[in-house]
């Protein structure tokens, strides 16, 4: 019984366990090694709607916990990730069996939190409208991840544009405008900047608000 308790056969690999998103790193690397970057990217897309942004900010804790890396036989997983998101072909999601929810969501403002929230709401099929002061998709991406290379920012803007989301660009996000649009939605979310304007005495929850 003691030996059985020590068995790790059914436990996740160290790299997978170290990943905050619990991505199947081994499977992703397997397909990358085979040259199937499309399949590798599909695995990465399971954990994020914007792989280039996540990859750019990833600190790769998987590498620190990889046993092969400890022996000097590991690979730079982060660099493999970069190659996958740049050269992999994005998958096309089927609309079959994807039923739109009845409740409508509204997001006010821009930044990392509103961007990823929009991606997650779209994935869950909530009709979502984003109201922002930016003039186009690329500037909206830049507001969330201005550190991205121009080519990567452009690719993420294309990804955002292809999503089933409604955008109202160039909005004047004043209180009267926001309150008017809030009446049209069942769920309302806001960037930290807009939230401070709506409730100046409330502090942002740093546990959920990505900065």
Q: Which residues make up each language-model segment?
A:
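Short, well-ordered loop/turn elements at secondary-structure boundaries
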Residues: 111, 183-184
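A conserved short coil-to-beta-strand element within the FAD-binding core of flavoproteins
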Residues: 168-182, 192
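Short, well-ordered alpha-helix to beta-strand connector turns
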Residues: 125, 164, 184-185, 206
